[in-house]
Amino acid sequence: MNYPYIPHTDEDIRAMLEFIGVSSIEDLFSSIPVSARSSLNIPESRDEFSVFKRLKEISEVNASLEDYAVFLGAGVYKRYVPTVVYDLAMKPDFLTAYTPYQAEVSQGTLQALFEYQTMVCELTGMEVANASMYDGATALAEAALMSFRLTGKEKVVVARSVHPEYRAVLRTYLEKRGFTVVEAGYDETGRVLLEEVDEETAAIAIQYPNFFGIIEDLDYVRSRSGNALLIVVVEPVSLALLEPPGSYGADIVVGEGQSLGLPMWFGGYSLGIFATKEKYVRQMPGRLIGQTVDQDGSVTYTMILQTREQHIRRARATSNICSNHAHAALIAAVYMSVMGPDGLREVARRSYSAAHYLQERLEDMGFKLCFSGEFFSEFVFNVPEDYPERWKWMMAKKILGPLPLKGFYPELGDTALACATEVISKEDIEKLLEAMK
């Protein structure tokens, strides 16, 4: 039977079978033992209308975050994304292009990635940024490897207040290669204590704001770093309000770019931010897009300094990162362009205000903050012992509550990490408070 979406006619199929010397399509599978064959148990075909109706019924079983009040942060955040972002980013011109190796036919994608790099530099206060990494965690691990290449040392001190899953990825990358990972503790403010730094330390890695939401004192961190390089893990939206790490002398800035227009799809897809000083550019992993002029004198863009193992000997490569998250970076570029500096600053301001209002209301109910340091849009507070069970109950009420922390930080006891972004309303907060009673 012929279908309009199948290119081969019955005559085409007969001609091909005759050419290869078999009488039917079934004969192509005759070598498969009968014992290995089974029915596919596929129902009879349906018309398009029936298929869409059935798929809609199945999809309605899923929970949509649009219906939930989300107080869950910890690295992935619910934010509002203007519709124009995906109208532009999902254009076939961008979606169908793979890696822009052939610069002469990829100028649109290359320019968008160049603009992404420029905006990341403006946000972080750094001199050069690459065209993206896989995610924030692997970007941190690559930063540590870069610090070893730059210093010739083999030890990194990472703050315990860095995202616990980032630290796990860091250890996975480093320890089997013989590198040393040492964790630095934190004080009652929630800020890092750097007592483990010595002359053998290649780099210090801290998060700003840290996993607890606390804004680290980068002046203190820089003063304690000695000759070690300073790696700062950032939440990019916060940098619209906070001083950029580059202004404190950070050597490498990495982070998760999901906040810049990407959805919360099961924790991804995500985007690794990576920026550094220009003098370190030849040790920077990943792809870098550069601007130049062509033979006619017109501005043009191309990939430069391709020191990946696809292009040079593995032993000399700075990274084995292959297909990076270029389209995610493009979405981030469109989002930052649409929002502009003022819009991004307003998103950060509203997130800060919502989180501090939530904190005040929780304290009014008797909940105590765990740390005294200033926070951005997340904070840790004490919760009842039965909170993990209550968290599940809140989900049934369409509330994604603050994250229980006991599994990540046993020393903190019964605590939770609360988050509020610009999409959280006072009504959402009251809904959470009612559930917390």
Swiss-Prot record:
Q: How does it assemble?
A: The glycine cleavage system is composed of four proteins: P, T, L and H. In this organism, the P 'protein' is a heterodimer of two subunits.
* Presence of keyword Oxidoreductase: yes
Give the InterPro entries listed for this entry. GcvPA (IPR023010), GDC-P_N (IPR049315), GDC_P (IPR020581), PyrdxlP-dep_Trfase (IPR015424), PyrdxlP-dep_Trfase_major (IPR015421), PyrdxlP-dep_Trfase_small (IPR015422)
Protein name, entry field: Probable glycine dehydrogenase (decarboxylating) subunit 1
Give this protein's Gene Ontology molecular function annotations: glycine dehydrogenase (decarboxylating) activity
Q: Could you list this entry's UniProt keywords, alphabetically sorted.
A: Oxidoreductase
Mitochondrion keyword on record:
no
Enzyme class, top EC level, equals: oxidoreductase
Query: Which SUPFAM superfamilies does the entry mention?
Result: PLP-dependent transferases
User: Pfam families attached here?
Assistant: GDC-P
**At the top level of its lineage, which domain of life is listed?**
Bacteria
Please list the reactions this protein catalyses: N(6)-[(R)-lipoyl]-L-lysyl-[glycine-cleavage complex H protein] + glycine + H(+) = N(6)-[(R)-S(8)-aminomethyldihydrolipoyl]-L-lysyl-[glycine-cleavage complex H protein] + CO2
What this chain does, per the record? The glycine cleavage system catalyzes the degradation of glycine. The P protein binds the alpha-amino group of glycine through its pyridoxal phosphate cofactor; CO(2) is released and the remaining methylamine moiety is then transferred to the lipoamide cofactor of the H protein.
Gene Ontology BP terms? glycine decarboxylation via glycine cleavage system; nucleoside metabolic process
Organism, per UniProt?
Thermotoga petrophila (strain ATCC BAA-488 / DSM 13995 / JCM 10881 / RKU-1)
